[in-house]
């Protein structure tokens, strides 16, 4: 057990169970789930022994955007006190983590409740509910239960709307359930949850005899008045409003679409629209033309169906508004079909609704100087957590209140008769404050639930309340497969522009933790592919895991290619929303490349032809080779080498990923030249004779006095050029991740289906996987670095443009409305006409190749000439690089072999110019390499004299170049 020492800043323990530690007045117990950047633990108050959920967020690998997300969540939760909203009880901080103490909900989330509805009658918490209100044939939940949950959801949403808050991620996984108040009073529960407020477990509406619903996870919530519009991509795809899928501005009505999808799922048992990607999802919504269909045998009432149809209007203008929703008959009228015992038990907010029904000693209210986040504490209902026999893994935790998969019981406390407490004051204690902000903890993955029928049967054997051991195993397996496909086919939680960074880190973490990559992948001769699949089914949840930023995006990955899925799912990296985290398959890639208008709110005026002269001032840039150690020659791709024909599919994938990463490294090096001229030199940093810094990084916030003597116009020029180059580098890095992700999904799919055409040994898989993992980890590190620097440069550009004369074309007052692609961003960035990454790269490659040709003719620095040629080729290949993977095999087949890396945005005539230049440089490179080979064989041969050069090498951090 962790130390009972209570401190403001919890200290990690070194005992055997590293998850146990002191968090203020709470003891953090075992892990019950893991999400993106956050691990959820069960916790207990060290004095009252009441239970909480502690979300521990790792701060070490989080970017600024995600930290703002978590800070926003904490800030919002501080001011929310409502029975149907999960409360933030306390907040504690260490140097590496921030710990959020949340209310504990024992019944899991609504998605699990619906999914396992056929076994609810066998659990003591829901046995009485099913006896009174059995689930209908042809439907999901009994309409009484549906209306009960909807009333409570509407109560919480009205509370949010009164405060101009929009949740932006309403979905069954974020709707948590607690045992009914009557189950507490009957002494059924054995775990006592800690109350966030006096009425935390007293429903504001609905029935006392049914489970209580709470909204959780406010990582995407924001203040949005009724007349305001937003444009950030947030929410879960299956429950996302079509206006968000279309990248249009939206208002609070987006939440009402999500409510409609949740209501439909409660009635039917599945979401109204399902697809393998966002584009297909939007297509199906549009194709439906607001004609919401219900299964013929579904017994839902006309009122419920009409409400769903009014909520699921594609056009937000036609969609029901909040006022009409809150005043609808389904919300305001009594629930029909109640049994006599439940008639007249509709609950309203009051002070006598204590779930325990007994007086609990309250701790004195702490003074303002007490530990941050100190709150009034009381014992509450003795509550057990529900486990579902079909699940083969731990219960999916949700923000703040996930139960563990094994009920925790306290002896001697189960059957104690409760009593009723006195009324309490309506004054609420203050929410805890936090000193620093962490990134938004990601949602926990949806773990695989149906590896095999045998695994399901074994899981049933572990539960005394499960169905009969001999009951319909085949049917249950099919049912689980169908539901798993529904859950995982499109279970990408975070759909936000900044999410690309999360996804990159997620996939890198997945590979780093995979036992297959680490050599732990083993075959079972008896169970075959299914057994092998089970070895990578769930995430690694050890407390000693070196990488803590495991996002949902990462942990959903294995399940995304499970055999039982009925969807042709694509990896999250194949979806770029005009940004990873989707062209019609990927909108984020368009924003990352073109250059990531949505990511940086950046607009572009029409680019000039890349063959024209650039406006970049003379810059010192020294070419460098990528992958110098492991590459036998410096020949670029497409050189006709016969060895390519002998490479198997995995080796080809490795080569493509490494080459794409290499091109990104070349572009990054060029961007660094621009970037370093914008960064002031630290006093302790040595300089070269030209006075230029040799540091690979070390930037800090801009100020008027830190421009190093540059004019305002020069600052704007450098910022624009650095920004477009960084964005180009990001697009190439993202593509590397896309390719690796597709390979990983393909490997998992092959293992599940047991494809006999792939005959690869475990050792070979480990070698290939390790090599890809090395590149992926490098890409992750570089992506995060470039993202931060691009944001810095963007801010620098905005600052510089504001300092320009009012009549300057680049002054913000002179930007045309149509010139900005980032109209939804808080601050738009417009780049001057002609400033494109492709043009800058072309000009630089041409300059380098010409200089190298002159040196080659004079016999000077031949090895440097080789490097210059290779770098120029790589840079031109990056110009021609397609920023999105072909969405279909037909797309790839339509391209000639030599044009598969062409960029559609480059004009055809300009493309031909680049292709000819690449061919010319390759010819010179081949001739030079032959010359170098001959010279190398001469005992006293020289590779040419080293010329004096005015080019300053671009410094790179140790290990900065892509590994092989």
From Swiss-Prot:
Comp. bias intervals (Polar residues): 387-403, 421-437, 537-553, 943-952
Coarse class of the protein's main subcellular location: cytoplasm
CDD domains named among the record's database cross-references: STKc_ATG1_ULK_like
Keywords: ATP-binding, Autophagy, Cytoplasm, Kinase, Membrane, Nucleotide-binding, Protein transport, Serine/threonine-protein kinase, Transferase, Transport
Keyword field contains Protein transport: yes
Name of the molecule in the record: Serine/threonine-protein kinase atg1
EC number of the protein: 2.7.11.1
Binding site for ATP: 32-40, 55
Source taxon at top rank: Eukaryota
Keyword Lyase recorded: no
Cellular localisation: Cytoplasm; Preautophagosomal structure membrane
Active site as annotated: 169
């Amino acid at each position: 057990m962790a130390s009972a020492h209570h401190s403001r800043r919890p200290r990690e323990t070194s005992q055997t169970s590293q998850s146990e530690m002191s968090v203020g007045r709470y003891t953090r117990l075992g892990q019950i789930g893991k999400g993106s950047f956050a691990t959820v633990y069960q916790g207990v108050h060290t004095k009252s022994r009441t239970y909480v959920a502690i979300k521990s967020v790792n701060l070490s690998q989080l970017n600024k955007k995600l930290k703002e997300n978590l800070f926003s969540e904490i800030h919002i939760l501080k001011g929310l006190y409502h029975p149907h909203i999960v409360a933030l009880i306390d907040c504690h901080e260490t140097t590496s983590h921030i710990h959020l103490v949340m209310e504990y909900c024992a019944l899991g989330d609504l998605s699990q409740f619906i999914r396992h509805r056929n076994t609810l009658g066998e659990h003591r918490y829901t046995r009485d509910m099913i006896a009174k209100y059995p689930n209908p044939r042809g439907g999901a939940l009994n309409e009484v239960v549906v209306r009960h949950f909807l009333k409570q959801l509407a109560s919480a949403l009205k509370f949010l709307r009164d405060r101009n808050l929009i949740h932006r991620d309403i979905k069954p996984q974020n709707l948590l359930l607690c045992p009914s108040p009557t189950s507490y009073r009957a002494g059924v529960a054995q775990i006592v949850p800690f109350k966030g407020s006096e009425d935390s477990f007293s429903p504001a509406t609905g029935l006392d005899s049914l489970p209580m619903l709470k909204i959780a996870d406010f990582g995407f919530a924001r203040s949005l008045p009724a007349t305001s519009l937003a444009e950030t991509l947030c929410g879960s795809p299956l429950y996302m409003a079509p206006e968000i899928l279309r990248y249009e501005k939206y208002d609070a009505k987006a939440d009402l679409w999500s409510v409609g999808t949740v209501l439909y799922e409660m009635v039917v048992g599945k979401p109204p629209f399902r697809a393998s990607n966002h584009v297909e999802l939007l297509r199906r919504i549009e194709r439906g033309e607001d004609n919401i269909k219900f299964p013929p045998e579904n017994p839902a009432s006309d009122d419920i169906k009409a409400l769903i149809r009014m909520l699921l209007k594609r056009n937000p203008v036609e969609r029901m508004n909040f006022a009409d929703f809150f005043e609808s008959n389904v919300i305001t009228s009594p629930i029909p079909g109640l049994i006599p015992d439940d008639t007249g038990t509709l609950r309203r907010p009051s002070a006598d609704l204590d779930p325990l029904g007994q007086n609990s000693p309250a701790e004195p209210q702490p003074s303002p100087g007490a530990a941050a986040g100190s709150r009034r504490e009381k014992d509450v209902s003795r509550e057990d957590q529900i486990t579902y026999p079909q699940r083969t893994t731990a219960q999916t935790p949700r923000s703040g209140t996930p139960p563990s998969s094994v009920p925790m019981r306290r002896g001697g406390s189960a059957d104690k008769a409760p009593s009723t407490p006195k009324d309490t004051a309506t004054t609420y204690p203050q929410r805890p404050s936090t000193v620093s902000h962490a990134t938004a903890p990601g949602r926990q993955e949806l773990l695989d639930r149906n590896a095999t029928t045998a695994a399901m049967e074994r899981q049933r054997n572990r539960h005394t309340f499960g169905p009969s051991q001999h009951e319909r195993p085949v049917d249950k397996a099919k049912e689980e497969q169908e539901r798993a496909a529904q859950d995982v086919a499109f279970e990408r939680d975070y759909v936000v522009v900044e999410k690309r960074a999360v996804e990159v880190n997620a996939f890198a973490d997945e590979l780093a933790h995979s036992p297959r990559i680490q050599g732990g992948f083993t075959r079972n001769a008896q169970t075959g592919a299914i057994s092998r699949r089970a070895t990578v089914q769930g995430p690694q949840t050890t407390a000693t895991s070196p990488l803590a930023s495991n996002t949902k995006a990462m942990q959903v990955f294995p399940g995304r290619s499970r055999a039982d899925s009925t969807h042709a799912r694509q990896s999250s990296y194949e979806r770029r929303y005009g940004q990873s985290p989707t062209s019609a398959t990927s909108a984020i890639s368009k924003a990352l490349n073109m250059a990531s208008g949505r990511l940086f709110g950046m607009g572009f005026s029409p680019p000039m032809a890349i063959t024209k002269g650039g406006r970049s001032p003379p810059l010192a840039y020294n070419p460098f080779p990528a992958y110098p150690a492991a590459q036998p020659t410096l020949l670029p791709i497409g050189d006709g080498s016969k060895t390519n024909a002998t490479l198997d599919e995995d080796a080809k994938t490795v080569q493509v990923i490494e080459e794409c990463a290499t091109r990104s490294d070349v572009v990054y090096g060029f961007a660094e030249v621009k970037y370093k001229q914008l960064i002031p030199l630290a006093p302790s940093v040595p300089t070269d004779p030209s006075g230029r810094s040799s540091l690979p990084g070390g930037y800090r916030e801009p100020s008027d006095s830190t421009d190093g003597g540059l004019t305002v116009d020069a600052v704007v020029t450098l910022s624009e050029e650095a920004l477009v180059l960084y964005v180009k580098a990001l697009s190439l890095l993202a593509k590397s991740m896309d390719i690796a992700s597709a390979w990983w999904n393909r490997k998992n799919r092959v293992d599940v289906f047991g494809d006999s055409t792939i005959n690869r040994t475990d050792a070979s898989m480990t070698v290939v996987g390790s090599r890809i993992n090395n590149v992926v980890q490098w890409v992750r590190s570089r992506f995060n670095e470039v993202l931060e620097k691009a944001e810095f440069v963007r801010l620098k550009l905005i600052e510089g443009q504001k300092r320009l004369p009012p009549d300057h074309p680049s002054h913000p007052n002179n930007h045309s409305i149509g010139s900005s692609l980032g109209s939804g961003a808080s601050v738009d960035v417009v780049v001057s006409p002609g400033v494109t990454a492709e043009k800058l790269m072309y000009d630089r490659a041409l300059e380098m190749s010409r200089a190298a040709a002159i040196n080659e003719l004079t016999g000077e620095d031949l090895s440097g000439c080789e490097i210059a040629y290779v770098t120029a080729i790589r840079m031109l290949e990056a110009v021609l690089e397609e920023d999105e993977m072909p969405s279909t095999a037909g797309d790839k087949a339509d391209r000639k072999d030599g044009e598969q890396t062409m960029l559609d945005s480059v004009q055809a005539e300009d493309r031909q110019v680049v292709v000819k230049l690449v061919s010319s440089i390759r010819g010179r490179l081949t001739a030079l390499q032959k010359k170098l080979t001959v010279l190398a064989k001469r005992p006293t041969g020289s590779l040419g004299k080293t010329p004096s050069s005015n080019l300053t090498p671009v410094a790179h951090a140790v290990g900065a170049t892509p590994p092989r």
